[in-house]
């Protein structure tokens, strides 16, 4: 269900929330992955929606503010500031001054949000966003805004500095804050810093990112808009079953939906058949590290996987063929972990057009939908891409998140692409999925 998403939010209070217990003053080093371009200065935002119909008398802002103070004892870097070192890398100064907390009130009820299917500028009111030109040393590593609606429901908008945590780390933090809100004494998963495991002098992934930036000229897309499309679990399972009958191979939901979106975007952009297209997606590398990183590690540990194909082959071949290309790219990271991330890949594609590159990110298992502040799990989770700077490695990308509770097993695709191809992209997606769903 779509909402009008036109509403007004009034800020009631803006305060710094310090840890409930004194934290040691110190400078903490970030890892090589934390300091990568496209990561270190990036801000990622999450919206958690709660209907809260059964505890209307309880003030969520008060509960969450107190929980924030308690959880910062265990996550003290979020109560500090980022600082630039002489070599240009960032480090964290644990000052103990706290995270920024904002209490706000909307002039309507939650129905205005619908299922958060489409982006609206009004949604940015649910987050506290600094001007785009704000220096990295002046930002708050963590901002939490609680916006109450007239029906008693509320939205928690959280902005994380990507240099301190990745998506899994952010989910771990929010789950811990929920535990504090529900009266737990300490987080169930102990947070671990240990960024020294990835030493700054290691070439771990740094070369790959710099190399990628060098071969990609500035985009000519211009404006990028945010949209969404939900693929139901029934549709996904139907396609997976068809591919299994065709090949006797298991295909994951991510592989199937990524292949569909890659084909649909390529066709919608009408890229010449003689050119190549590249798909880039992220994979968690915690289990690949030797020894494996502890569960509580919340720093960046995501690797970039690349798959490339010729446009003519991509569009004329079968869906199974594209799924296999994605599978092969995933296996390459598992099998060649060290060599893949330390040395440049052979056969680099310096001539590929920037517009022919698309990024994918799977946010379904980060734990955001499990965050419980005392009102149960979030009824809906979404993202608003409002970063400080345009430092993304790719401008056109897709993020996979869980749909609202009424369709928990499907995939909601958040798309970021030129406005001129939004309709054609959705048309191509529907055409392909219908071919499998209506198959006799």
Swiss-Prot record:
Domain of life: Eukaryota
Pfam families for the chain: Transferase (PF02458)
Pathway, per record: Alkaloid biosynthesis; taxol biosynthesis; baccatin III from 10-deacetyl-2-debenzoylbaccatin III: step 2/2
MF GO annotations: 10-deacetylbaccatin III 10-O-acetyltransferase activity
Reaction equations catalysed: 10-deacetylbaccatin III + acetyl-CoA = baccatin III + CoA
E.C. number(s) listed in UniProt: 2.3.1.167
Gene Ontology biological process: paclitaxel biosynthetic process
Disulfide bonds: none
Residues annotated as the enzyme's active site: 162, 372
Cited Gene3D superfamilies: Chloramphenicol acetyltransferase-like domain (3.30.559.10)
Family: Belongs to the plant acyltransferase family.
Quaternary structure and partners: Monomer.
Name of this protein: 10-deacetylbaccatin III 10-O-acetyltransferase
């Amino acid at each position: 269900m779509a909402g009008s998403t036109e509403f007004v939010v009034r800020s009631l209070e803006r305060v710094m929330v310090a840890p409930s217990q004194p934290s040691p003053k110190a400078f903490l080093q970030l890892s090589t992955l934390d300091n990568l371009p496209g990561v270190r200065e990036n801000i990622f935002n999450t919206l958690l929606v709660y209907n809260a119909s059964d505890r209307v008398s309880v003030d969520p802002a008060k509960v969450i503010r107190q929980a924030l103070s308690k959880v910062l004892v265990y996550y003290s870097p979020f109560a500090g500031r980022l600082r630039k070192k002489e070599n240009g890398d960032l480090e964290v100064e644990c000052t103990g001054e706290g995270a920024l907390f904002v209490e706000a009130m909307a002039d309507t009820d939650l129905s205005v949000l619908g299922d958060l299917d489409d982006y609206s500028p009004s949604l940015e009111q649910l987050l506290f966003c600094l001007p785009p030109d704000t220096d990295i040393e002046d930002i708050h590593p963590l901002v939490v805004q609680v916006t109450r609606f007239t029906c008693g429901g509320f939205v928690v908008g959280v902005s994380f500095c990507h240099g301190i945590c990745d998506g899994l780390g952010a989910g771990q933090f929010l789950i811990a804050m929920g535990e504090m809100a529900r009266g737990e004494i300490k987080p169930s998963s102990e947070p671990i810093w240990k960024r020294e495991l990835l030493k700054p002098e290691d070439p771990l992934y740094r070369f790959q990112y710099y190399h990628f930036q060098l071969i990609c000229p500035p985009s000519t897309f211009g404006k990028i808009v945010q949209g969404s499309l939900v693929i139901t679990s029934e549709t996904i399972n139907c396609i997976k079953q068809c591919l299994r009958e065709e090949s006797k191979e298991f295909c994951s939901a991510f592989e199937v939906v990524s292949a569909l979106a890659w084909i649909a975007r390529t066709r919608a952009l009408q890229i010449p058949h003689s050119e190549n297209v590249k798909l880039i997606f992220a994979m968690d590398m915690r289990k690949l590290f030797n020894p494996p990183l502890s569960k509580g590690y919340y720093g960046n540990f995501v690797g970039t996987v690349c798959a490339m194909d010729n446009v003519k082959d991509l569009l004329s071949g079968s869906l199974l063929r594209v799924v296999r290309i994605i599978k092969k790219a995933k296996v390459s990271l598992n099998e060649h972990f060290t060599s893949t991330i330390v040395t440049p890949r052979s056969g680099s594609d310096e001539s590929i057009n920037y517009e022919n590159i698309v990024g994918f990110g799977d946010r379904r298992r980060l734990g955001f939908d499990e965050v419980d502040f005392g009102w149960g799990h979030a009824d809906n989770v979404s993202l608003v891409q409002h970063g400080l700077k345009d430092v993304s490695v790719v401008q056109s990308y897709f993020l996979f998140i869980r749909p609202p509770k009424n369709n928990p097993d499907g995939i909601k695709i958040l798309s970021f692409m030129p406005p001129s191809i939004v309709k054609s992209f959705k048309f191509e997606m529907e055409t392909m999925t219908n071919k499998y769903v209506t198959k006799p």
